[in-house]
């Protein structure tokens, strides 16, 4: 169902607040994106250089510190849905990169759950391997940027319904 402009504006304002809160997290890059309903959502990217060693899915201590801080943002916004997407650079083949990207997303998920984030809030955990680069894989810097985990925070059906009623 289409969501009206008034509802979109209410959710947009809410996401601006969430974005500002998430921007305080160490090592997080934050931006506003559109969700599948065309509503504002917040994408938080964590650089895998901070999160993981090359070819590994175990979280580093600095990653745990950042994710513990980020879990507070998620807990403060428990009515939002979450998707966790892992990515790799194009070094190696899909047989390695695809499962590695899934393992990285699962590592982030497990740690967020251990920090008190509710499992019901997390709607999707997936890996996209090297299929969705954000930088040039032919440079070391580009590959570093492509090794990442993204966490999307978006309006749940309940949040949309509340915004529609408030409108």
Positions of predicted regions on the chain:
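Short, low-complexity, glycine-enriched hydrophobic/amphipathic alpha-helices that associate
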Residues: 1-20
């Amino acid at each position: 169902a289409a969501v009206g402009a008034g509802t979109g504006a209410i959710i947009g304002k809410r996401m601006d607040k969430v974005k500002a809160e998430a921007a305080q997290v160490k090592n997080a890059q934050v931006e506003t994106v559109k969700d599948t309903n065309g509503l504002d959502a917040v994408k938080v990217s964590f650089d895998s250089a901070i999160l993981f060693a090359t070819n590994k899915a175990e979280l580093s201590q600095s990653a745990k510190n950042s994710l513990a801080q980020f879990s507070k943002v998620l807990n403060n916004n428990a009515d939002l849905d979450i998707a966790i997407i892992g990515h790799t650079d194009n070094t190696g083949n899909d047989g390695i990169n695809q499962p590695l990207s899934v393992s990285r997303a699962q590592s982030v998920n497990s740690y967020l759950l251990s920090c008190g984030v509710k499992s019901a809030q997390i709607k999707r955990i997936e890996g996209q391997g090297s299929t969705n680069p954000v930088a040039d894989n032919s440079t070391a810097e580009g590959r570093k940027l492509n090794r990442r985990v993204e966490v999307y925070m978006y309006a749940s059906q309940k949040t949309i319904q509340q915004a529609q009623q408030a409108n």
